[in-house]
């Protein structure tokens, strides 16, 4: 049996743009993607801390070092520039490998730079 587990998370990123006229997706700084192991076209869940919206889209790599987090297409209706979001990717992990699975979590600062990179979330973390 396989279980769906969190594979990577970008925590508390700040939306830099919302582009309604684009076809779809979320554009994310490629340096940040590399740090957590997310890739182009990967399906991700977006959680908006400001309004509680949760939705799925896919990744488009953005300019390295830019700190860009741009929601495109219909998803642009669910965020505003400056909103705090969480970007989560998941993986299907075989039951026998669950104990070895270590997701990567990037905790972002207010300028969309990685403040901390951790291999697992401690219980009762408040940021």
From Swiss-Prot:
Pathway: Cofactor biosynthesis; (R)-pantothenate biosynthesis; beta-alanine from L-aspartate: step 1/1. Substrate binds at residues 57, 73-75. Its main location: cytoplasm. The gene is panD. It comes from Geobacillus thermodenitrificans (strain NG80-2). PANTHER family: ASPARTATE 1-DECARBOXYLASE (PTHR21012:SF0). Is synthesized initially as an inactive proenzyme, which is activated by self-cleavage at a specific serine bond to produce a beta-subunit with a hydroxyl group at its C-terminus and an alpha-subunit with a pyruvoyl group at its N-terminus. The modification Pyruvic acid (Ser) is found at residue 25. Heterooctamer of four alpha and four beta subunits. This is Aspartate 1-decarboxylase. Its EC number is 4.1.1.11. Its cofactor is pyruvate. One of its GO terms (biological process) is alanine biosynthetic process. It catalyses: L-aspartate + H(+) = beta-alanine + CO2. It is found in: Cytoplasm. It holds the Pfam family Asp_decarbox. Belongs to the PanD family.
